[in-house]
C-alpha cells in the first residue's frame, strides 16, 4: 500500500514562533504581548499570500492556551492542550473560512458560539481566514461582539486584501502587516528542508525557486515539491529547475552581452535564434536582458552590490562582466531595452523588432568610442 505523501508546506508548517520564517517583527510583538499579558481581543493579520498569516494565528492560539509555557514564551507541545491542538482535536480553536461562510447567518452562528466559555484552557480563539470575503451585513453583525467580546474570547482575522475591510472593523483590531519573505530566507529554509529530506540540492536551484516564488514561502515549497518529483526524488539541479519552470538560463544573458561588447552582430542573432527555438518568448527575453543590464550596473559600485540577490558564484560572474562594460554602454543598452519592451506589443514583426534593438546595442561600443574621440578633438581645438 502506498504511503500518503504530505506536501512540504504542511509537513514543515512551523509549530512555534521561533520556526516562523521571515516575520521576526510579528513573532517578537506577539511573544511580548503574551509575556506582558497585553493580548488584544482582536487581531488582524494582513499581507500577501503564503507568508505565514494563518500559521501565526494557529501558533498564537496554541501558545496562549499552553499550560506549561517555555522560558522564552513558546508553546511546550507536551501539555494536554498542545497535544489536542497538534492533533486537530482542540475545542478551544475554531477556524472559519470566510470565503465559503460569508453570510450574515454564518457570523450569527459564530456569535452564538462565543457565549460559551472554554471547557478546558484559558481562551477560545476564533480564526477567520479570508475575512475580506464577508458581506457588509456579516461585518455589521460582527461589530459588537468584536468590540466587546467575553474575556475568554480572542478573534484573529486574516486577509490578503486589507482595503476591502470596512473601517469600523479595522478600528477594533490590532493590525499586523506581514512582509513578503526575502529570497535569502526562502533559500535557507529550502536548504533546511532538502537536508531533512536527504535531497542533494544545488544552491543555484534553490535560489531560482526562491526568486520565482515572489516572496511567498508556500509557493516556493510547492515548486520545490514539483521539481523534486520531476527529478526522481533525491537530487535537485539548476538545469532541471530551469527546464521545469521554463525559465531562460541566465548564462544566455552573459553570452549575449559578451557578443554585444565584441560588436559581433552575427553571434548575437544566432544566440537569440537559439533562445526562440527553445520556445522562449522574445518579450520575456528583452525584459530578462534589461534586468541583466540593471544587475551589471548595480555591480559597478561596491556600495550597491548587495542589491543583487544571487549566489556568490553568480555574483563573481556579474562583477567580472560589469568591469568590461562602461556606464555609458549600460545606460544606452538599458534605454534601448526599455524602448523595445514598450513598443513590443504594437510591433507587426516582433522578432525583427528585438533583433533591431540587439543590432543597435552591438554598435553601442563603437558609437561611444567615436563620441569620446570627437569630444577629445573638440577640446584640442579649444
Describe each PLM feature range.
Residues 1-175, 193:
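P-loop/Walker A NTP-binding region and its immediately flanking N-terminal helices
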Amino acid at each position: 500500500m502506498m504511503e500518503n505523501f504530505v506536501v512540504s508546506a504542511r509537513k514543515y508548517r512551523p509549530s512555534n514562533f521561533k520556526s516562523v520564517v521571515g516575520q521576526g517583527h510579528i513573532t517578537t510583538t506577539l511573544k511580548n504581548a503574551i509575556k506582558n499579558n497585553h493580548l488584544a481581543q482582536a487581531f488582524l493579520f494582513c499581507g500577501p499570500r503564503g507568508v505565514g498569516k494563518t500559521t501565526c494565528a494557529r501558533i498564537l492560539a496554541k501558545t496562549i492556551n499552553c499550560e506549561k509555557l517555555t522560558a522564552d514564551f513558546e508553546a511546550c507541545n507536551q501539555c494536554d492542550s498542545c497535544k489536542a491542538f497538534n492533533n486537530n482535536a482542540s475545542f478551544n480553536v475554531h477556524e472559519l473560512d470566510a470565503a465559503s461562510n460569508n453570510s450574515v447567518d454564518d457570523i450569527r452562528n459564530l456569535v452564538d458560539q462565543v457565549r460559551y466559555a472554554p471547557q478546558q484552557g484559558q481562551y477560545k480563539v476564533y480564526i477567520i481566514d479570508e475575512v475580506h470575503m464577508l458581506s457588509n451585513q456579516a461585518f455589521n453583525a460582527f461589530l459588537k461582539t468584536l468590540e466587546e467580546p467575553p474575556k475568554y474570547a480572542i478573534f484573529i482575522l486574516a486577509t490578503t486584501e486589507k482595503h476591502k475591510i470596512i473601517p469600523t472593523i479595522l478600528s477594533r483590531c490590532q493590525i499586523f502587516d506581514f512582509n513578503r519573505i526575502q529570497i535569502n530566507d526562502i533559500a535557507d529554509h529550502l536548504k533546511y528542508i532538502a537536508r531533512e529530506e536527504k535531497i542533494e540540492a544545488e544552491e543555484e536551484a534553490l535560489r531560482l525557486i526562491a526568486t520565482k516564488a515572489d516572496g511567498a514561502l508556500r509557493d516556493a515549497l510547492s515548486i520545490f515539491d514539483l521539481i523534486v518529483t520531476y527529478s526522481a526524488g533525491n537530487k535537485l539541479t539548476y538545469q532541471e529547475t530551469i527546464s521545469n519552470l521554463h525559465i531562460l538560463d541566465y548564462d544566455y544573458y552573459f553570452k549575449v552581452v559578451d557578443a554585444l561588447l565584441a560588436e559581433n552582430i552575427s553571434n548575437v542573432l544566432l544566440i537569440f535564434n537559439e533562445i526562440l527555438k527553445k520556445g522562449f518568448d522574445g518579450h520575456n527575453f528583452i525584459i530578462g536582458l534589461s534586468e541583466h543590464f540593471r544587475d551589471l550596473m548595480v555591480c559597478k559600485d561596491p556600495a550597491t552590490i548587495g542589491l543583487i540577490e544571487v549566489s556568490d558564484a553568480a555574483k563573481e560572474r556579474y562583477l567580472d562582466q560589469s568591469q568590461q562594460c562602461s556606464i555609458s554602454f549600460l545606460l544606452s543598452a538599458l534605454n534601448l531595452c526599455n524602448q523595445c519592451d514598450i513598443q513590443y506589443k504594437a510591433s507587426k514583426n516582433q522578432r525583427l523588432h528585438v533583433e533591431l534593438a540587439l543590432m543597435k546595442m552591438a554598435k553601442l561600443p563603437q558609437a561611444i568610442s567615436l563620441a569620446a574621440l570627437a569630444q577629445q578633438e573638440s577640446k584640442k581645438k579649444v
